[in-house]
Structure formats: structure tokens, C-alpha cells
């Protein structure tokens, strides 16, 4: 018997049909939707993130969307805390949390808990940035390779934010990020049914991504990014502006290349994101059932059967 309450994970790459399936499930099962998407958290970033429409949200309200301003920071630790709170609230109502999205790091944080990484320290970060201005980030990347070769191998020498964080962790704790991330936190107190949805043919996903990006442009994506660009308090190194599509449109607005090139690069970046998400899922160490994006009614029945079986055994 399952002593833990049940929750459902509906994972998958971008443009795989997660939202549509979640809305259908919300109509037929006692579930409430929690978004697991590091882009949907931002207010005012609706078109480029493919945020569910008002009509879709009326059918299936999503928790943890539109929760912070694009200038604010939000970590996997923030997500875990927020998601656990929402899951507990849903469970107390006698309903089932349905977690939907493609940010695999968030799912991992939920399932395994978080490593005891130190909180950010602005003084330490400022010192690292001063050092970078003097010697360059490539030099700091070499320093990181001596301290933490595993992290250094994973981090691009131009990725200033991640280099800064890895060095900051070492300077504060005296331990490398690799050492600390091997220590796991508290595990998720739920029995999880895990599903991943994607087209069997990768070419179909690529076509979906391209079609969706062009639809975003028609819906005013450039104008959405222009509003962010002209706010004056945002910049390209923020996680919000580094979201796929936004970064490329931002670079277009500052004159790096024309709109056609921005669209092309945005589509390529979205395809690369989807590839990374699928790679995460292929290497997922937990039991997972794959669903074909082209078989939505069949997918719905598979999840309903698994849900019913779990409820009977619980």
C-alpha cells in the first residue's frame, strides 16, 4: 500500500503538447496543475514563453506562473519550497498535484532534495567580478579548473554567471560545488507517477518548434521584448532575458543582427533546448512512462489507468 500521497509528473521537451494534455486531464481527474517551468515564472513574459492563454488557464489554473518580475532571481531551492507548499495545499483539498513542465532541474530538486550550497553573498560576488574585470573570465575559468575540474569541464569559459557561482561556493564554504552537490537533501514525500511526452519522430518536434516560433512573432513577440528592453533595469545576463527566444530578440533590438536572423537563431536555440530536455529524460534514473505527442486521447487513458490503479492500491 502507498502510505504517501500521490502526485503526477508530466514532463517533456518544449512544444511536445504537455499543456494540452494537462488541460484534458484537469477536466477528467481530481488534479490541480503546478507549472514546472523556469520561464513561466516571469510576469510580462507571455508570448515567448508560450504561457497558457486566459482561456486555457480558465480550464486548468496553473500554480507557479507569473510569480516574479524579470529583474528578480529564482532558484531551484525557491521552486522546491514553493512547489512543496502548493502540493501540500492541493493534497489537503483531497486533490492530486499534477506537475507539468520541462525544467528538469526543478524536478530533480523536488525528487532528491537540494545540496547544502551556501546562499549567495554579494560581497564575494563583487570581489569575483572585480577580479574578472582585471584578468578576464577565461582566467577565472582556469582557476575554477584547479579548484573544481568537474564543474569547470561543464561550464563554458564565457559563462560568467556560472563561473561566478562556482567560485563563490568555494570561497564561502571551502568546498567545491561538485563535493557539495553529492550531498543530497530531504526527498519528496509523495508517491510519484512519472510520464514524459514527446513525438517519436524528432523531425515532428522540430517542425512544431518552428511553427510555434513563427506564430509567436505574429502574436507580437518582438513588441513584448521591446517593452522589456526599454524598461531600463533589465540586461542580457539576467536568467529571464537568457530564456530561449528572448535572448535572440534582445540581441536583435540592440543591433546585433536583423529580425530574420533573430528568428532563425531563436528557432535553433529552442531546438537545442528540446534536445537537452530529451537528453535529461533519456538518462532519468526514475521509472518513467513515455507518451507519444500524436496520441493525445490514448495518452490520457494511459495516465487515467495508472492513476486509478494507484488509487485502488493506496
Swiss-Prot record:
Residues 37-40, 161-165, 242-247, 275-282 are annotated as: Interaction with substrate tRNA. Gene3D superfamilies: 1.10.20.140, P-loop containing nucleotide triphosphate hydrolases. ATP binds at residues 12-19. Its cofactor is Mg(2+). It is an enzyme of class 2 (transferase). It catalyses: adenosine(37) in tRNA + dimethylallyl diphosphate = N(6)-dimethylallyladenosine(37) in tRNA + diphosphate. GO terms for molecular function: ATP binding; tRNA dimethylallyltransferase activity. Catalyzes the transfer of a dimethylallyl group onto the adenine at position 37 in tRNAs that read codons beginning with uridine, leading to the formation of N6-(dimethylallyl)adenosine (i(6)A). This is tRNA dimethylallyltransferase. It comes from Mannheimia succiniciproducens (strain KCTC 0769BP / MBEL55E). The lineage of its organism: Bacteria, Pseudomonadati, Pseudomonadota, Gammaproteobacteria, Pasteurellales.
Amino acid at each position: 500500500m502507498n502510505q504517501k500521497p500521490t502526485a503526477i509528473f508530466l514532463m517533456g521537451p518544449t512544444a511536445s503538447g504537455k499543456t494540452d494534455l494537462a488541460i484534458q486531464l484537469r477536466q477528467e481527474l481530481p488534479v490541480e496543475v503546478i507549472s514546472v517551468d523556469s520561464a513561466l515564472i516571469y510576469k510580462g513574459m507571455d508570448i515567448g514563453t508560450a504561457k497558457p492563454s486566459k482561456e486555457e488557464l480558465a480550464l486548468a489554473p496553473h500554480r507557479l506562473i507569473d510569480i516574479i518580475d524579470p529583474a528578480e532571481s529564482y532558484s531551484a531551492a525557491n521552486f522546491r519550497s514553493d512547489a512543496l507548499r502548493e502540493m501540500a495545499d492541493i493534497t489537503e483539498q483531497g486533490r492530486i498535484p499534477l506537475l507539468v513542465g520541462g525544467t528538469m532541474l526543478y524536478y530533480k530538486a523536488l525528487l532528491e532534495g537540494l545540496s547544502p550550497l551556501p546562499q549567495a553573498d554579494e560581497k564575494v560576488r563583487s570581489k569575483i567580478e572585480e577580479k574578472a574585470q582585471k584578468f578576464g573570465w577565461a582566467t577565472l575559468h582556469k582557476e575554477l579548473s584547479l579548484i573544481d575540474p568537474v564543474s569547470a569541464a561543464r561550464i563554458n569559459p564565457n559563462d560568467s554567471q556560472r563561473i561566478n557561482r562556482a567560485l563563490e561556493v568555494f570561497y564561502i564554504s571551502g568546498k567545491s560545488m561538485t563535493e557539495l552537490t553529492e550531498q543530497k537533501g530531504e526527498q519528496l514525500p509523495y508517491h510519484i507517477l512519472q510520464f514524459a511526452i514527446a513525438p517519436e519522430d524528432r523531425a515532428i518536434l522540430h517542425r512544431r518548434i518552428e511553427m510555434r516560433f513563427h506564430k509567436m512573432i505574429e502574436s507580437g513577440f518582438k513588441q513584448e521584448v521591446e517593452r522589456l528592453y526599454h524598461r531600463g533595469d533589465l540586461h542580457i545576463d539576467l536568467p529571464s532575458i537568457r530564456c530561449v527566444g528572448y535572448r535572440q530578440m534582445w540581441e536583435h533590438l540592440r543591433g546585433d543582427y536583423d529580425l530574420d536572423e533573430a528568428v532563425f537563431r531563436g528557432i535553433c536555440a529552442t531546438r537545442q533546448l528540446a534536445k537537452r530536455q530529451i537528453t535529461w529524460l533519456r538518462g532519468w534514473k526514475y521509472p518513467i512512462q513515455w507518451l507519444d505527442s500524436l496520441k493525445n486521447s490514448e495518452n490520457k487513458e494511459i495516465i487515467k489507468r495508472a492513476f486509478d490503479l494507484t488509487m485502488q492500491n493506496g
